[in-house]
Structures are given as structure tokens and as C-alpha cells.
């Protein structure tokens, strides 16, 4: 059963958003190549400018919970956390089983 992993990221400085988006595109593409059980990665940009919104959301489909742990411990993920840590105002995560998603939503 696939696990869906979400990461929400809000930049401290709006001008940094394009660079962070580009970094995520490049690095998550590499993660997907190095971890075959990462089935898909989608980087989404917020389209409504509200103070309470996050700027970027990453949606990952992972083969199982072991893949989540492998991703969290992966060198690229650890490096991204260091690089973006100072750029983040807020970061949030959420995990659910794919079977719990409502296809009509």
C-alpha cells in the first residue's frame, strides 16, 4: 500500500521562492532516481497570495513506510534540510495512506 508524504514550505523572504522551487525540482528529481521506491514527486506552487498559506508543497508517493524512512535519512534530504533551514519561515509535514485519499476531492 502506497504512502503519500506531503511537505509544506513557507519562505522567510518572498524573493527567495523561485530559487527554493528550483532547488527542490532539481534535488527531488535526483532523490527519485536514487530511491526507486519513491514512485512520484510533484512540486506544487501556491497560487493564492494569503499570509497563512505555504509557498511550496511537495507531494511524494512512496512504496511503503520503509521508503519514507530511507528518504528521510537520505544524504540529499539531509543536505536540503541544511540548505533550506535558514530560508524557511515554516515547514510542515503530513503522511497518509493512499487508500485514505478521497478521489472525489
Predicted features and spans:
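Short, flexible helix/strand-to-coil boundary loops that buttress conserved ligand/catalytic motifs
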Residues: 72, 81-84
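Short S/T/G/P-rich N-terminal loop/turn motif that feeds into the first structured element of a domain
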Residues: 1-55, 63-73, 96-105
